[in-house]
């Protein structure tokens, strides 16, 4: 629902907060997700914003599995969710009847290349990949991709979550 803009860039490190209005409508999915996110704020629900989910399983929905199978990678730093860290927290939050929107990612941001370098170093020393620019990516995809860093200050006020780079390694 967010993408880097004039106020939030990869370089400046200014994240998006739970209160920020969606600014990314580059695909039908993101349009629906953005409007749903705004509607969720009007109800007494727990809304956990997961991004680029990572697990320790080889699974088609696992972000690492996905990018190791892509022909080319557009490497931009993003917030990501390591599910082994976060799913137990979500259960505790539900048991406590917590409400509201939470950016449900590990603190920090990590690039696709950083993850693939770790994959190569730890899993497959022969692994290779090619990069392309965001513009080149947009030319071949039906919809654009959002890239962003989310603040986890609200989540960290409830529980400590490990930094993304520590957790992925």
What is the meaning of each model-derived region?
Residues 7, 28, 34, 54-65, ...:
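Glycine/proline-rich active-site loop of Rossmann-fold NAD(P)-dependent oxidoreductases
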Residues 78-81, 110, 150:
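Residue-level signal for the nucleotide or nucleotide-sugar donor/cofactor binding architecture
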Residues 89, 93-147:
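Mid/C-terminal beta-alpha module of Rossmann-like enzyme folds, strongest
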């Amino acid at each position: 629902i967010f993408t880097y803009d004039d106020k939030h860039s990869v370089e400046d490190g200014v994240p998006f907060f739970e209160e920020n209005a969606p600014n990314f409508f580059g695909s039908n999915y993101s349009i629906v997700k953005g409007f749903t996110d705004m509607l969720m704020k009007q109800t007494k629900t727990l809304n956990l914003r997961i991004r680029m989910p990572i697990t320790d399983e080889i699974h088609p929905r696992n972000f690492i599995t996905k990018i190791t199978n892509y022909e080319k990678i557009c490497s931009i730093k993003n917030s990501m969710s390591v599910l082994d860290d976060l799913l137990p927290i979500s259960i505790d939050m539900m048991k406590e009847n917590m409400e509201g929107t939470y950016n449900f990612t590990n603190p920090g941001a990590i690039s696709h290349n950083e993850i693939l370098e770790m994959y190569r170093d730890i899993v497959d020393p022969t692994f290779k990949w090619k990069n392309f620019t965001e513009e080149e990516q947009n030319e071949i995809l039906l919809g654009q991709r959002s890239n962003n860093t989310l603040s986890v200050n609200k989540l960290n006020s409830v529980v400590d979550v490990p930094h993304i780079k520590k957790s992925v390694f």
